[in-house]
């Protein structure tokens, strides 16, 4: 009899733990995002609205986010924000869940031109959050904008020791590949080698590689022209730096950071609620205005001040967007080729 009572007690305790674990899981979301991508107070507002607590942590690169999810397979996050080609990579590796868009009532707010991209047709695995591009920036005090209209202009010998490049293999090679008339998502090894040889010719003009903040070389007067992210360019212009954006005739390099749900997420319903919350027009507008990045949320864009939506540093016209190229997954083996050549380039 005593044994039976003990057995019932143990069963009760274990069942209680399971109930607590279930309740805890469904009232908590683990959100892993880029640094400075959510304004202060928004997650607290979500918790107040839904009762769901958000455990928030950040990363500085897609690579570090990917490595962490690969390493800690058991204790995963519920919501992440990978960039363009990492969506395709993680989807192909079975690391992402298909998203039930029927539960996203605010999905309708998104601009159709940012949906159904090659890295995730039909947006089955990703929901756009923030987008941007890499293009050419010049210090207008040093360089006449009429002299720059192409990626090829960076190779002009008169810009010796004047150019800043982003410290990213794919983006730097995309510049050379577009200059040569190839796709920035090139997988042909001969074309990649040709791009490397073209970049070797650019070495005398390169003063620095920077990815922490591509705007810093311009602030410090180190660079007169080079590659820049539009968010960095916009921030510099607000600081009064004489920076001007140039759209190369070959097209810009476009990227998008999107919501995605890891395949081993414990609170999928909570993740969907948070996505839907962040897709609200008012919330997305707040994200765009405070972070200084472009929003793919058409309803949110209508709420932004005119000086922001009319600034082509953040919102270029449709023709420019159509001319640009979105990064896509090229596979690990090809990516290793890019990285290998890139290290050789930087060691030249």
Go through each PLM region and give its residues:
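Mature extracytoplasmic/periplasmic domains
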Residues: 262-322
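Periplasmic-binding protein-like
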Residues: 192-201, 237-263, 309
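Extracytoplasmic ligand-binding site segments that recognize negatively charged/polar headgroups
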Residues: 76-77, 81-87, 91-205, 210-219
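A bilobed periplasmic-binding-protein/Venus flytrap-type ligand-binding module shared by bacterial periplasmic
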Residues: 135-142, 178-179, 255-267, 286
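A ligand-binding cleft/hinge motif common to bilobed small-molecule-binding domains
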Residues: 86-89, 219, 224-242
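Conserved C-terminal helix/tail region of periplasmic/extracytoplasmic solute-binding proteins
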Residues: 319-348
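Early extracytoplasmic/lumenal segment of secretory-pathway proteins
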Residues: 22-89, 216
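Bacterial N-terminal signal peptides
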Residues: 4-17
């Amino acid at each position: 009899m005593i044994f039976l009572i003990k057995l019932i007690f143990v069963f009760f305790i274990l069942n209680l733990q399971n109930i607590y674990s279930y309740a805890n899981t469904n009232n908590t979301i683990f959100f892993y995002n880029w640094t400075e991508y959510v304004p202060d107070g928004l997650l607290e507002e979500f918790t107040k609205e839904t009762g769901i607590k958000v455990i928030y942590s950040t990363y500085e690169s897609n690579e570090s986010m990917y490595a962490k999810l690969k390493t800690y397979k058991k204790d995963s996050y519920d919501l992440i924000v990978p960039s363009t080609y990492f969506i395709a990579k993680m989807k192909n590796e079975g690391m992402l869940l298909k998203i039930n868009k029927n539960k996203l009532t605010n999905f309708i707010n998104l601009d159709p031109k940012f949906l159904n991209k090659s890295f995730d047709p039909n947006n089955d695995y990703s929901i756009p959050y923030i987008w941007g591009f890499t293009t050419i920036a010049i210090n207008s005090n040093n360089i006449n904008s009429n002299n720059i209209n192409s990626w090829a202009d960076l190779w002009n010998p008169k810009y010796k020791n004047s150019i800043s490049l982003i410290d990213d293999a794919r983006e730097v090679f995309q510049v050379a590949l577009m200059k040569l008339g190839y796709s920035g998502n090139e997988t042909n090894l001969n074309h990649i080698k040709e791009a490397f040889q073209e970049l070797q010719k650019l070495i005398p003009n390169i003063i620095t590689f920077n990815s922490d903040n591509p705007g810093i070389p311009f602030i410090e007067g180190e660079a007169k022209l080079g590659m820049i992210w539009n968010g960095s360019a916009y921030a510099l212009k607000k600081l009064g730096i004489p920076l001007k954006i140039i759209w190369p005739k070959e097209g810009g390099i476009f990227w998008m950071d999107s919501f995605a749900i890891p395949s081993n997420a414990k609170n999928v319903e909570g993740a969907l609620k948070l996505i839907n919350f962040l897709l609200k027009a008012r919330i997305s507008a707040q994200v765009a205005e405070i972070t200084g990045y472009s929003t793919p949320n058409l309803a949110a864009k209508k709420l932004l001040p005119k000086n922001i939506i009319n600034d082509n540093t953040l919102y270029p016209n449709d023709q420019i967007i159509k001319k640009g190229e979105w990064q896509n997954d090229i596979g690990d083996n090809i990516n290793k080729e890019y990285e290998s050549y890139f290290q050789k380039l930087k060691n030249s």
